[in-house]
Curated annotation (Swiss-Prot):
EC number, UniProt record: 7.1.1.-
InterPro entries for the chain: NADH_UbQ_OxRdtase_chain4L/K (IPR001133), NUOK/Mnh_C1-like (IPR039428)
Gene Ontology CC terms: chloroplast thylakoid membrane
Name the UniProt record assigns to this protein: NAD(P)H-quinone oxidoreductase subunit 4L, chloroplastic
Protein species of origin: Marchantia polymorpha (Common liverwort)
UniProt entry tagged with the keyword Membrane: yes
Membrane topology summary: Multi-pass membrane protein
Family: Belongs to the complex I subunit 4L family.
UniProt keyword annotations, A-Z: Chloroplast, Membrane, NAD, NADP, Plastid, Plastoquinone, Quinone, Thylakoid, Translocase, Transmembrane, Transmembrane helix, Transport
Primary location: plastid
Function description: NDH shuttles electrons from NAD(P)H:plastoquinone, via FMN and iron-sulfur (Fe-S) centers, to quinones in the photosynthetic chain and possibly in a chloroplast respiratory chain. The immediate electron acceptor for the enzyme in this species is believed to be plastoquinone. Couples the redox reaction to proton translocation, and thus conserves the redox energy in a proton gradient.
Location within or outside the cell: Plastid, Chloroplast thylakoid membrane
Reactions accelerated catalytically: a plastoquinone + NADH + (n+1) H(+)(in) = a plastoquinol + NAD(+) + n H(+)(out); a plastoquinone + NADPH + (n+1) H(+)(in) = a plastoquinol + NADP(+) + n H(+)(out)
Gene Ontology molecular functions: oxidoreductase activity, acting on NAD(P)H, quinone or similar compound as acceptor; quinone binding
Amino acid sequence: MLEHILTLSAFLFCIGVFGLITSRNMVRALMCLELIFNAVNINLVAFSNFLDSSQIKGEIFSIFIIAIAAAEATIGLAIVLAIYRNRKSTRIDQFNLLKW
């Protein structure tokens, strides 16, 4: 059963990395980053259940990761909204805000 869960997690992780590398839209890149975080959470819960099912350390750690991912998504979407108000675009290749 562990192999199936790890295969699912690896598949989600690969989809997230592929989407993060190839996406030109910033909102889509944030969604792919969340997909990567969810793949990591699945791994944590699976290994926690496989190694020691009497303790819930992996589940608690994944709850912390979900909270951090929610904060990251909130901050990321706020930045995207601020950039969209200034530039009228969410394409990553059009952002040159740090150039002089």
